[in-house]
């Protein structure tokens, strides 16, 4: 009888321990207004920013300071997303799909292979898609805050213009521009980790010139979400951010600049080619939205459909991508492109340049035949710039970049002070 009493006591204790463990698998660690943050949210983020965390590196999970930093970032994210809900700010899914297509191209994956890869690292595609949506949403909100709150004085701009080097506006570059995006208010360890990877790529490039292959070889589960590789056409020195000026003075073809840290991430720039092209001042700067169907040169019916889209847009003031959703059953419209481009009028190909010259602000062209197929073109903005205005514009953007951290810090402090935030131990 005594044996059974002891057995029942032990069984009860074991059961309570197991049930207690089950109850504490997840828990609420913070309240942010009407939202909650779970312990599992923090652990998932730690997993996504550490290497081989499941291979015996469990002490990271116990690092209180690291845990606290991730919690702080999630609190900031919650505050920002609550603003997007209140103001009904959304992201165009066309941009997001284009970004994911760039990732597929970078890693040389089909869509199915990409889904399988995400599954192997503990993510499903829907969760990944939502994470990228949130990232783009945060960036858009922060950009709005920057432009609303940035107060840059004329004397500040004058100081930068006086200090800056004289640029050769006739010098143009073909660039491979690699951007490693950073979270809002990144921790020093996040910056160090990405900067280390950027330096590794530059070092390995001495032995392998294929940068995309190097990224695929040396990146891991975290990097896939934060690298963008953009290969430019000819771009004038005046259109390259001022943070690169000191390097562009003496740069040669094949040289690599970076890593350089700015408000929108860490940058590496590879100089693929250099040329000189006479630019006549003043410069006509154009911002335009160009929309069309890939490989549509031979398909005459697309011209009629693009004309119909133009007419519908002008009548209903509907965006390009919304019109395309209505035509998604047509196989031709499975591969549409939409890009907002800002560059000199002279840098557009002749057919686009001719169309832009005839448009008024926000007016949409008739279908234009280009080297890439048929396109609709919408003029967003046009401005005439002399050399001094070009230098002032570059200085303004440079100061905007420098003030980013301070403006974001003050704004987030205001959000915190106006919100109910409770940390639950």
Swiss-Prot record:
GO cellular component term, pick one: outer membrane-bounded periplasmic space
Any Gene Ontology biological process: protein stabilization
UniProt GO MF annotations: peptide binding; peptidyl-prolyl cis-trans isomerase activity; unfolded protein binding
Leading EC class: isomerase
Signal peptide (from-to): 1-20
Annotated localization: Periplasm
InterPro entries, per the entry: OMP_Chaperone_SurA, PPIase_dom_sf, PPIase_PpiC, PPIase_SurA, SurA_N, Trigger_fact/SurA_dom_sf
Catalytic reaction list: [protein]-peptidylproline (omega=180) = [protein]-peptidylproline (omega=0)
Pfam families: Rotamase, SurA_N
Superkingdom of the source species: Bacteria
Entry's EC annotation: 5.2.1.8
PpiC domain mapped to chain residues: 170-273, 271-381
Keywords, sorted A to Z: Chaperone, Isomerase, Periplasm, Repeat, Rotamase, Signal
Role of this protein: Chaperone involved in the correct folding and assembly of outer membrane proteins. Recognizes specific patterns of aromatic residues and the orientation of their side chains, which are found more frequently in integral outer membrane proteins. May act in both early periplasmic and late outer membrane-associated steps of protein maturation.
Free-text note regarding domains: The PPIase activity resides only in the second parvulin domain. The N-terminal region and the C-terminal tail are necessary and sufficient for the chaperone activity of SurA. The PPIase activity is dispensable for SurA to function as a chaperone. The N-terminal region and the C-terminal tail are also required for porin recognition.
Protein name in UniProt: Chaperone SurA
Native species: Blochmanniella pennsylvanica (strain BPEN)
């Amino acid at each position: 009888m005594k044996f059974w009493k002891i057995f029942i006591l032990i069984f009860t204790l074991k059961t309570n321990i197991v049930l207690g463990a089950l109850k504490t698998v997840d828990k609420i660690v913070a309240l942010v207004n009407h939202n909650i943050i779970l312990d599992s949210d923090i652990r998932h983020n730690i997993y996504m920013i550490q290497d081989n965390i499941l291979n015996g590196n469990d002490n990271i999970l116990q690092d209180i300071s690291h845990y606290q930093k991730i919690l702080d970032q999630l609190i900031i994210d919650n505050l920002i997303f609550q603003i997007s809900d209140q103001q009904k700010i959304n992201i165009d899914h066309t941009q997001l799909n284009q970004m994911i297509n760039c990732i597929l191209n970078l890693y040389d994956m089909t869509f199915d292979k990409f889904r399988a890869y995400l599954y192997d690292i503990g993510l499903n595609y829907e969760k990944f898609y939502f994470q990228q949506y949130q990232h783009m949403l945060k960036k858009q909100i922060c950009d709005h805050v920057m432009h609303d709150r940035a107060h840059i004085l004329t004397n500040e701009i004058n100081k930068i213009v006086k200090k800056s080097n004289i640029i050769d506006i006739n010098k143009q570059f073909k660039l491979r521009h690699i951007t490693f995006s950073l979270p809002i208010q990144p921790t020093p360890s996040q910056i160090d980790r990405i900067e280390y990877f950027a330096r590794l790529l530059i070092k390995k490039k001495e032995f392998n010139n294929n940068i995309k292959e190097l990224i695929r070889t040396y990146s891991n589960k975290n990097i896939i979400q934060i690298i963008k590789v953009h290969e430019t056409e000819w771009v004038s020195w005046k259109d390259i951010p001022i943070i690169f000026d000191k390097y562009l003075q003496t740069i040669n073809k094949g040289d690599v600049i970076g890593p350089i840290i700015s408000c929108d991430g860490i940058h590496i720039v590879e100089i693929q080619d250099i040329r000189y092209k006479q630019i006549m001042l003043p410069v006509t700067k154009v911002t335009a939205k160009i929309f069309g169907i890939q490989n549509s040169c031979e398909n005459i019916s697309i011209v009629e459909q693009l004309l119909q889209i133009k007419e519908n847009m002008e009548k209903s003031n509907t965006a390009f991508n919304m019109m395309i959703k209505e035509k998604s059953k047509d196989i031709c419209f499975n591969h549409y492109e939409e890009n907002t481009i800002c560059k000199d009028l002279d840098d557009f190909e002749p057919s686009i340049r001719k169309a832009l010259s005839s448009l008024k602000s926000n007016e949409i062209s008739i279908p234009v035949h280009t080297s890439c197929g048929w396109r609709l073109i919408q003029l967003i903005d046009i401005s005439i710039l002399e050399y001094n205005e070009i230098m002032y514009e570059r200085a303004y953007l440079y100061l905007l970049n420098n003030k980013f951290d301070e403006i974001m810090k003050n704004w987030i402090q205001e959000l915190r002070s106006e919100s109910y935030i409770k940390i639950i131990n």
